[in-house]
Amino acid sequence: MAERIENIPVTLNDKRILTLIGYRRRPKVIDHSVLKLLVEEKEEAMRLIRPEALFAVLDHSETNRHPIFDHAEKVAFCLCTIGAELEAQSSGHFRSNDMLRGLILDAIGSEAAEGVARHADLALAKLARKMDLWPSKRFSPGYKNWDLSEQKFVFDILPAKEMGVTLNASLMMIPRKSVSFGMNYYRDSQFTTRKSFP
């Protein structure tokens, strides 16, 4: 049965947002107009972001036995989103030819969605340790050895429509500012690639 992760904070890191819009990691000079828009759009984003996360923990025998789950005692599956409102607002800016504002708001949305995923990752790692199991790093469909087609399996497990998240024909999530991932729970710590534990 799927459960919700409650009280998800919205975290927005200016450096990561600036990197997403094309600035180097340690820019010496940032255009004043960019900084002004960043402040304005962060305020706007806080009104638009609706952070949600659903998860379910399955025994290995309940999974589809994909090789990425090898050696896991259990596997946690998670779906995170910030909702559709920010994306709609950003698209509106692009349609109005306000490209920089649209780009900045879109980057803020990406940072916010990843922030929800980081919060969920930590919550699920803590849950693993409560079960006396060892969590892996999170892994998402389409990365490394987990094909994008596995997105369907995640959506079979989790009631994504409760959060307003769907898959299109290309297996991309709508709203786009959504993140899905799996996390293996191991009985033996030797199998985990995670460097630190809560």
Regions found by a protein language model. Give the residues of each.
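Generic structural signal of hydrophobic/aromatic residues within well-ordered alpha-helices
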Residues: 17, 45, 90-91, 104, ...
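Generic secondary-structure signature for well-ordered alpha-helical cores
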Residues: 43-51, 125, 129, 159
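Active-site helix-to-loop segments that bind/position phosphate- or nucleotide-bearing substrates
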Residues: 1-101
